[in-house]
UniProtKB/Swiss-Prot annotation:
This is Probable isoprenylcysteine alpha-carbonyl methylesterase ICMEL2. One of its GO terms (cellular component) is Golgi membrane. The chain crosses the membrane at residues 97-117, 152-172. One of its GO terms (biological process) is response to abscisic acid. Its main location: endoplasmic reticulum. Residues 1-55 are annotated as: Disordered. It is found in: Endoplasmic reticulum membrane; Golgi apparatus membrane. Substrate binds at G158, G159, A160, Q229, S230, A231. One of its GO terms (molecular function) is prenylcysteine methylesterase activity. Catalyzes the demethylation of isoprenylcysteine methylesters. May act as a negative regulator of ABA signaling. It is a multi-pass membrane protein. Plants silencing ICMEL2 show enhanced ABA inhibition of seed germination.
Amino acid sequence: MQLSPERCRPMSENREAWSANSEEMELLHGSNRLSSPEHVRRRVSGNSSEDGSPRICRQQSFGRDIGHAAAETYLITRLSFNLLGYLGVGYRWITRLLALACYAMLLMPGFLQVAYLYFFSSQVRRSIVYGGHPRNRLDLYIPPTSDGLKPVVVFVTGGAWIIGYKAWGSLLGLQLAERDIIVACLDYRNFPQGTISDMVSDAAQGISFVCNNISAFGGDPNRIYLMGQSAGAHISSCALFEQAIKESRGESISWSVSQIKAYFGLSGGYNLFNLVEHFHNRGLYRSIFLSIMEGEESFKQFSPEVRLKDLNVRKAAALLPHIILFHGSADYSIPPEASKTFTDALQAAEVKAELVMYKGKTHTDLFLQDPLRGGKDELFDHIVSMIHADDSDALRNDAVAPPRKRLVPEFLLKLAGRVSPF
Protein backbone atom coordinates (compact mmCIF):
# COMPACT_ATOMS: atom_id res chain seq x y z
CA MET A 1 0.00 0.00 0.00
CA GLN A 2 1.34 3.40 -1.00
CA LEU A 3 0.62 6.21 1.43
CA SER A 4 -0.04 9.60 -0.09
CA PRO A 5 2.70 12.10 0.78
CA GLU A 6 -0.03 14.50 1.87
CA ARG A 7 -2.24 12.17 3.91
CA CYS A 8 -1.67 9.75 6.72
CA ARG A 9 -4.71 7.89 8.05
CA PRO A 10 -5.19 7.07 11.71
CA MET A 11 -3.13 4.14 12.88
CA SER A 12 -6.12 1.84 13.45
CA GLU A 13 -7.04 1.97 9.73
CA ASN A 14 -3.56 1.23 8.44
CA ARG A 15 -2.00 -1.24 10.88
CA GLU A 16 -2.35 -4.21 8.53
CA ALA A 17 -1.50 -2.27 5.38
CA TRP A 18 1.83 -1.06 6.74
CA SER A 19 3.13 -4.62 6.87
CA ALA A 20 2.65 -5.06 3.10
CA ASN A 21 5.71 -3.21 1.81
CA SER A 22 8.65 -4.14 -0.40
CA GLU A 23 11.09 -6.95 0.38
CA GLU A 24 13.78 -4.46 1.35
CA MET A 25 11.43 -2.76 3.76
CA GLU A 26 10.40 -6.10 5.26
CA LEU A 27 14.06 -7.12 5.64
CA LEU A 28 14.79 -4.09 7.78
CA HIS A 29 11.39 -3.91 9.42
CA GLY A 30 11.40 -7.61 10.27
CA SER A 31 8.47 -8.59 12.46
CA ASN A 32 8.40 -5.23 14.17
CA ARG A 33 4.72 -4.50 13.56
CA LEU A 34 3.28 -1.27 14.79
CA SER A 35 2.16 -1.77 18.37
CA SER A 36 1.30 0.45 21.26
CA PRO A 37 3.36 0.78 24.45
CA GLU A 38 0.73 -1.33 26.20
CA HIS A 39 1.43 -4.15 23.78
CA VAL A 40 5.16 -3.70 24.29
CA ARG A 41 4.82 -3.90 28.06
CA ARG A 42 2.49 -6.89 27.83
CA ARG A 43 4.99 -8.74 25.67
CA VAL A 44 7.84 -7.95 28.03
CA SER A 45 5.89 -8.83 31.16
CA GLY A 46 4.80 -12.08 29.53
CA ASN A 47 8.28 -13.52 29.79
CA SER A 48 7.34 -15.79 32.67
CA SER A 49 4.94 -18.73 32.62
CA GLU A 50 4.63 -22.17 34.06
CA ASP A 51 4.85 -24.16 30.84
CA GLY A 52 8.23 -22.83 29.79
CA SER A 53 6.91 -21.15 26.62
CA PRO A 54 8.59 -17.81 27.44
CA ARG A 55 11.97 -19.32 26.75
CA ILE A 56 10.86 -20.04 23.19
CA CYS A 57 9.48 -16.51 22.95
CA ARG A 58 12.77 -15.04 24.15
CA GLN A 59 14.73 -17.21 21.72
CA GLN A 60 12.54 -16.11 18.82
CA SER A 61 12.80 -12.48 19.89
CA PHE A 62 16.58 -12.78 20.19
CA GLY A 63 16.74 -14.35 16.73
CA ARG A 64 14.72 -11.50 15.28
CA ASP A 65 16.99 -8.97 16.96
CA ILE A 66 20.08 -10.66 15.55
CA GLY A 67 18.53 -10.71 12.09
CA HIS A 68 17.55 -7.07 12.41
CA ALA A 69 21.06 -6.15 13.57
CA ALA A 70 22.53 -7.92 10.53
CA ALA A 71 20.16 -6.09 8.20
CA GLU A 72 20.98 -2.74 9.80
CA THR A 73 24.72 -3.45 9.52
CA TYR A 74 24.26 -4.27 5.84
CA LEU A 75 22.43 -0.99 5.27
CA ILE A 76 25.10 1.06 7.05
CA THR A 77 27.81 -0.66 4.99
CA ARG A 78 25.90 0.06 1.79
CA LEU A 79 25.53 3.72 2.77
CA SER A 80 29.28 3.92 3.31
CA PHE A 81 29.93 2.55 -0.18
CA ASN A 82 27.42 5.02 -1.60
CA LEU A 83 29.48 7.79 -0.05
CA LEU A 84 32.66 6.27 -1.47
CA GLY A 85 31.22 6.03 -4.97
CA TYR A 86 29.90 9.56 -5.15
CA LEU A 87 32.75 11.41 -3.52
CA GLY A 88 35.27 9.76 -5.79
CA VAL A 89 38.97 9.49 -5.09
CA GLY A 90 40.39 12.83 -4.08
CA TYR A 91 42.93 13.82 -1.48
CA ARG A 92 40.36 15.67 0.62
CA TRP A 93 38.08 12.67 0.69
CA ILE A 94 40.88 10.16 1.41
CA THR A 95 42.23 12.18 4.33
CA ARG A 96 38.75 12.60 5.75
CA LEU A 97 38.00 8.91 5.34
CA LEU A 98 41.11 8.00 7.32
CA ALA A 99 40.28 10.59 9.95
CA LEU A 100 36.72 9.26 10.16
CA ALA A 101 37.97 5.71 10.69
CA CYS A 102 40.25 6.84 13.53
CA TYR A 103 37.48 8.96 15.01
CA ALA A 104 35.03 6.06 15.02
CA MET A 105 37.56 3.67 16.57
CA LEU A 106 38.32 6.06 19.41
CA LEU A 107 34.62 6.42 20.23
CA MET A 108 33.85 2.72 19.73
CA PRO A 109 33.44 1.94 23.47
CA GLY A 110 30.49 4.33 23.56
CA PHE A 111 29.08 3.29 20.19
CA LEU A 112 28.97 -0.37 21.24
CA GLN A 113 27.03 0.43 24.42
CA VAL A 114 24.54 2.56 22.52
CA ALA A 115 24.20 -0.10 19.79
CA TYR A 116 23.40 -2.76 22.37
CA LEU A 117 20.60 -0.65 23.84
CA TYR A 118 19.36 0.28 20.38
CA PHE A 119 18.93 -3.34 19.34
CA PHE A 120 17.86 -4.93 22.61
CA SER A 121 16.14 -2.32 24.79
CA SER A 122 12.38 -2.83 25.18
CA GLN A 123 12.03 0.97 25.14
CA VAL A 124 13.07 1.14 21.48
CA ARG A 125 10.57 0.37 18.72
CA ARG A 126 12.62 0.15 15.53
CA SER A 127 11.68 0.64 11.91
CA ILE A 128 8.02 1.60 12.17
CA VAL A 129 6.82 2.28 8.63
CA TYR A 130 5.39 5.75 8.04
CA GLY A 131 5.15 5.83 4.24
CA GLY A 132 5.33 3.84 1.03
CA HIS A 133 8.84 4.74 -0.16
CA PRO A 134 12.07 2.95 0.75
CA ARG A 135 13.59 4.31 3.96
CA ASN A 136 10.20 5.61 5.13
CA ARG A 137 10.67 4.29 8.65
CA LEU A 138 11.18 5.71 12.09
CA ASP A 139 12.42 4.55 15.49
CA LEU A 140 10.49 5.35 18.65
CA TYR A 141 12.17 5.78 22.04
CA ILE A 142 9.56 5.33 24.75
CA PRO A 143 10.06 6.42 28.40
CA PRO A 144 10.02 3.66 31.04
CA THR A 145 6.98 5.16 32.80
CA SER A 146 3.48 5.23 31.34
CA ASP A 147 1.76 7.81 33.52
CA GLY A 148 0.09 10.51 31.44
CA LEU A 149 0.77 11.78 27.94
CA LYS A 150 4.43 12.58 27.20
CA PRO A 151 5.99 15.40 25.20
CA VAL A 152 7.41 14.29 21.86
CA VAL A 153 10.53 15.19 19.88
CA VAL A 154 10.60 14.40 16.15
CA PHE A 155 14.27 14.18 15.23
CA VAL A 156 15.73 14.33 11.71
CA THR A 157 19.32 13.15 11.67
CA GLY A 158 22.19 14.55 9.63
CA GLY A 159 24.65 12.82 7.32
CA ALA A 160 25.61 15.23 4.53
CA TRP A 161 22.39 14.29 2.66
CA ILE A 162 24.17 11.03 1.72
CA ILE A 163 24.61 8.86 4.82
CA GLY A 164 21.80 10.05 7.07
CA TYR A 165 20.25 7.22 9.08
CA LYS A 166 17.68 7.06 11.87
CA ALA A 167 19.97 5.15 14.24
CA TRP A 168 22.35 8.14 14.35
CA GLY A 169 19.86 9.68 16.77
CA SER A 170 19.81 6.69 19.13
CA LEU A 171 21.93 8.27 21.88
CA LEU A 172 19.76 11.39 21.91
CA GLY A 173 16.62 9.26 21.85
CA LEU A 174 17.71 7.04 24.73
CA GLN A 175 18.78 9.97 26.89
CA LEU A 176 15.64 12.04 26.28
CA ALA A 177 13.46 8.99 26.96
CA GLU A 178 15.06 8.78 30.40
CA ARG A 179 13.68 12.29 30.99
CA ASP A 180 10.14 11.18 30.17
CA ILE A 181 10.20 12.44 26.57
CA ILE A 182 9.18 10.30 23.59
CA VAL A 183 11.55 10.59 20.63
CA ALA A 184 10.77 9.67 17.01
CA CYS A 185 13.93 9.44 14.87
CA LEU A 186 13.02 9.67 11.18
CA ASP A 187 14.77 7.90 8.35
CA TYR A 188 14.51 9.32 4.83
CA ARG A 189 15.79 8.70 1.32
CA ASN A 190 19.40 9.80 0.93
CA PHE A 191 21.25 10.73 -2.24
CA PRO A 192 21.43 8.99 -4.74
CA GLN A 193 18.22 7.19 -3.75
CA GLY A 194 16.56 10.58 -3.64
CA THR A 195 17.34 14.26 -3.99
CA ILE A 196 16.49 17.14 -1.69
CA SER A 197 12.80 17.33 -2.66
CA ASP A 198 12.42 13.63 -1.80
CA MET A 199 14.16 14.14 1.55
CA VAL A 200 11.93 17.08 2.46
CA SER A 201 8.83 15.16 1.37
CA ASP A 202 9.85 12.15 3.47
CA ALA A 203 10.48 14.33 6.51
CA ALA A 204 7.09 16.00 6.12
CA GLN A 205 5.36 12.64 5.84
CA GLY A 206 7.18 11.35 8.91
CA ILE A 207 6.13 14.43 10.89
CA SER A 208 2.55 13.89 9.69
CA PHE A 209 2.65 10.29 10.90
CA VAL A 210 3.81 11.35 14.35
CA CYS A 211 1.24 14.14 14.62
CA ASN A 212 -1.59 11.78 13.70
CA ASN A 213 -0.52 8.64 15.55
CA ILE A 214 1.73 9.41 18.51
CA SER A 215 -1.14 9.40 21.01
CA ALA A 216 -1.34 5.61 20.55
CA PHE A 217 2.13 5.42 22.09
CA GLY A 218 1.38 7.72 25.00
CA GLY A 219 2.58 10.87 23.26
CA ASP A 220 0.86 14.22 23.58
CA PRO A 221 -0.13 15.47 20.09
CA ASN A 222 -0.27 19.00 21.51
CA ARG A 223 3.34 18.91 22.73
CA ILE A 224 5.37 17.99 19.66
CA TYR A 225 8.82 19.49 19.08
CA LEU A 226 10.72 19.27 15.80
CA MET A 227 14.50 18.94 15.83
CA GLY A 228 17.16 18.46 13.16
CA GLN A 229 20.93 18.15 13.25
CA SER A 230 23.34 19.26 10.49
CA ALA A 231 21.81 18.21 7.13
CA GLY A 232 18.78 17.09 9.13
CA ALA A 233 18.37 20.64 10.43
CA HIS A 234 18.31 21.87 6.84
CA ILE A 235 15.81 19.20 5.72
CA SER A 236 13.48 19.63 8.69
CA SER A 237 13.50 23.43 8.41
CA CYS A 238 12.58 23.13 4.72
CA ALA A 239 9.73 20.75 5.62
CA LEU A 240 8.49 23.18 8.26
CA PHE A 241 8.61 26.14 5.85
CA GLU A 242 6.87 24.20 3.07
CA GLN A 243 4.11 23.20 5.46
CA ALA A 244 3.64 26.80 6.63
CA ILE A 245 3.40 27.98 3.02
CA LYS A 246 0.80 25.31 2.16
CA GLU A 247 -1.17 26.20 5.26
CA SER A 248 -1.08 29.94 4.47
CA ARG A 249 -2.46 29.20 0.99
CA GLY A 250 -5.32 27.13 2.37
CA GLU A 251 -4.11 23.91 0.75
CA SER A 252 -5.14 20.48 2.01
CA ILE A 253 -2.78 19.38 4.79
CA SER A 254 -2.39 16.30 6.98
CA TRP A 255 -0.64 18.12 9.84
CA SER A 256 -0.46 21.70 10.99
CA VAL A 257 2.51 23.87 11.84
CA SER A 258 0.53 24.88 14.92
CA GLN A 259 1.07 21.34 16.25
CA ILE A 260 4.81 22.05 16.53
CA LYS A 261 5.49 23.84 19.81
CA ALA A 262 9.08 24.73 18.92
CA TYR A 263 11.79 23.95 16.39
CA PHE A 264 15.35 23.10 17.47
CA GLY A 265 17.99 23.46 14.76
CA LEU A 266 21.38 22.02 15.70
CA SER A 267 24.50 22.92 13.67
CA GLY A 268 22.47 23.46 10.52
CA GLY A 269 22.82 25.40 7.28
CA TYR A 270 19.83 27.29 5.93
CA ASN A 271 21.20 29.21 2.92
CA LEU A 272 22.55 26.97 0.15
CA PHE A 273 24.05 29.90 -1.76
CA ASN A 274 26.46 30.48 1.13
CA LEU A 275 27.37 26.82 1.57
CA VAL A 276 28.19 25.42 -1.86
CA GLU A 277 31.79 26.69 -2.00
CA HIS A 278 32.40 25.91 1.66
CA PHE A 279 31.33 22.29 1.18
CA HIS A 280 33.37 22.00 -2.03
CA ASN A 281 36.51 23.05 -0.18
CA ARG A 282 35.80 20.48 2.52
CA GLY A 283 35.32 17.55 0.14
CA LEU A 284 31.60 17.58 -0.72
CA TYR A 285 32.32 18.60 -4.28
CA ARG A 286 30.25 21.17 -6.11
CA SER A 287 28.99 18.74 -8.77
CA ILE A 288 27.69 16.33 -6.13
CA PHE A 289 26.14 19.11 -4.06
CA LEU A 290 24.33 20.47 -7.11
CA SER A 291 23.02 16.98 -7.91
CA ILE A 292 21.74 16.56 -4.35
CA MET A 293 20.05 19.97 -4.41
CA GLU A 294 18.59 19.55 -7.92
CA GLY A 295 20.71 22.29 -9.44
CA GLU A 296 21.45 25.86 -8.48
CA GLU A 297 18.02 26.90 -9.74
CA SER A 298 16.54 25.08 -6.72
CA PHE A 299 18.73 26.81 -4.14
CA LYS A 300 16.14 29.45 -3.29
CA GLN A 301 13.35 26.91 -2.81
CA PHE A 302 15.47 24.93 -0.35
CA SER A 303 17.02 27.89 1.47
CA PRO A 304 14.64 28.95 4.27
CA GLU A 305 16.79 31.99 5.03
CA VAL A 306 16.44 33.25 1.46
CA ARG A 307 12.72 32.51 1.25
CA LEU A 308 12.08 34.72 4.26
CA LYS A 309 13.04 37.73 2.13
CA ASP A 310 10.19 36.96 -0.28
CA LEU A 311 7.18 39.08 0.64
CA ASN A 312 4.90 36.32 -0.69
CA VAL A 313 5.93 34.01 2.16
CA ARG A 314 5.68 36.57 4.97
CA LYS A 315 2.15 35.36 5.71
CA ALA A 316 3.54 31.84 6.07
CA ALA A 317 6.33 33.08 8.34
CA ALA A 318 3.71 34.29 10.81
CA LEU A 319 2.62 30.67 11.28
CA LEU A 320 6.07 29.40 12.26
CA PRO A 321 6.65 28.21 15.83
CA HIS A 322 9.33 29.42 18.21
CA ILE A 323 12.66 28.63 16.55
CA ILE A 324 15.81 28.01 18.57
CA LEU A 325 19.10 27.46 16.77
CA PHE A 326 22.14 25.90 18.43
CA HIS A 327 25.66 26.07 17.04
CA GLY A 328 29.25 25.63 18.16
CA SER A 329 31.58 28.57 17.59
CA ALA A 330 34.36 26.17 16.48
CA ASP A 331 32.20 24.33 13.93
CA TYR A 332 34.14 23.98 10.68
CA SER A 333 31.71 21.62 8.92
CA ILE A 334 28.92 24.21 8.83
CA PRO A 335 30.10 27.68 9.90
CA PRO A 336 28.31 29.16 12.93
CA GLU A 337 27.54 32.18 10.75
CA ALA A 338 24.91 29.98 9.05
CA SER A 339 22.77 29.93 12.19
CA LYS A 340 23.44 33.59 12.95
CA THR A 341 22.26 34.90 9.58
CA PHE A 342 19.20 32.64 9.68
CA THR A 343 18.30 33.92 13.14
CA ASP A 344 18.66 37.50 11.90
CA ALA A 345 16.41 36.77 8.92
CA LEU A 346 13.79 35.14 11.14
CA GLN A 347 13.75 38.04 13.56
CA ALA A 348 13.53 40.52 10.67
CA ALA A 349 10.43 38.62 9.53
CA GLU A 350 9.04 38.95 13.07
CA VAL A 351 9.37 35.23 13.81
CA LYS A 352 10.16 34.40 17.42
CA ALA A 353 13.72 33.11 17.13
CA GLU A 354 16.88 32.89 19.19
CA LEU A 355 20.43 31.68 18.74
CA VAL A 356 22.39 29.77 21.37
CA MET A 357 26.11 29.74 20.58
CA TYR A 358 28.43 27.34 22.43
CA LYS A 359 31.93 28.73 22.69
CA GLY A 360 34.67 26.40 21.47
CA LYS A 361 32.30 23.59 20.46
CA THR A 362 32.74 21.78 17.15
CA HIS A 363 30.24 20.12 14.82
CA THR A 364 30.42 16.82 16.71
CA ASP A 365 31.04 18.11 20.25
CA LEU A 366 27.41 19.03 20.77
CA PHE A 367 25.90 15.90 19.25
CA LEU A 368 28.46 13.18 20.03
CA GLN A 369 31.40 13.88 22.32
CA ASP A 370 29.47 15.78 24.99
CA PRO A 371 26.65 13.20 25.27
CA LEU A 372 29.21 10.37 25.37
CA ARG A 373 31.07 12.21 28.12
CA GLY A 374 28.07 11.95 30.44
CA GLY A 375 27.43 14.23 33.40
CA LYS A 376 26.22 17.76 32.72
CA ASP A 377 25.52 18.73 29.11
CA GLU A 378 24.49 22.32 28.37
CA LEU A 379 22.69 21.56 25.11
CA PHE A 380 20.79 18.59 26.52
CA ASP A 381 19.78 20.50 29.64
CA HIS A 382 18.67 23.47 27.55
CA ILE A 383 16.43 21.33 25.33
CA VAL A 384 14.92 19.41 28.26
CA SER A 385 14.24 22.61 30.21
CA MET A 386 12.41 24.12 27.24
CA ILE A 387 10.30 21.00 26.69
CA HIS A 388 9.41 20.79 30.39
CA ALA A 389 8.98 24.55 30.88
CA ASP A 390 5.22 24.26 31.52
CA ASP A 391 5.44 21.09 33.62
CA SER A 392 6.47 21.84 37.20
CA ASP A 393 6.56 18.16 38.18
CA ALA A 394 8.88 17.32 35.30
CA LEU A 395 11.16 20.24 36.18
CA ARG A 396 11.40 18.99 39.77
CA ASN A 397 12.28 15.52 38.51
CA ASP A 398 14.91 16.99 36.19
CA ALA A 399 16.48 18.84 39.11
CA VAL A 400 17.10 15.59 41.00
CA ALA A 401 17.84 13.37 37.99
CA PRO A 402 21.08 11.37 38.36
CA PRO A 403 24.00 12.49 36.19
CA ARG A 404 24.20 10.72 32.86
CA LYS A 405 26.60 7.81 32.63
CA ARG A 406 30.00 8.35 31.02
CA LEU A 407 30.31 6.09 27.96
CA VAL A 408 33.83 6.94 26.75
CA PRO A 409 36.98 7.73 28.77
CA GLU A 410 38.05 11.37 28.65
CA PHE A 411 41.40 10.73 26.98
CA LEU A 412 39.67 8.94 24.08
CA LEU A 413 37.22 11.82 23.70
CA LYS A 414 40.06 14.32 23.54
CA LEU A 415 41.92 12.23 20.95
CA ALA A 416 38.71 11.86 18.92
CA GLY A 417 38.25 15.62 18.99
CA ARG A 418 41.76 16.07 17.59
CA VAL A 419 41.30 13.68 14.65
CA SER A 420 37.65 14.44 13.89
CA PRO A 421 37.11 15.17 10.18
CA PHE A 422 33.99 17.22 10.97
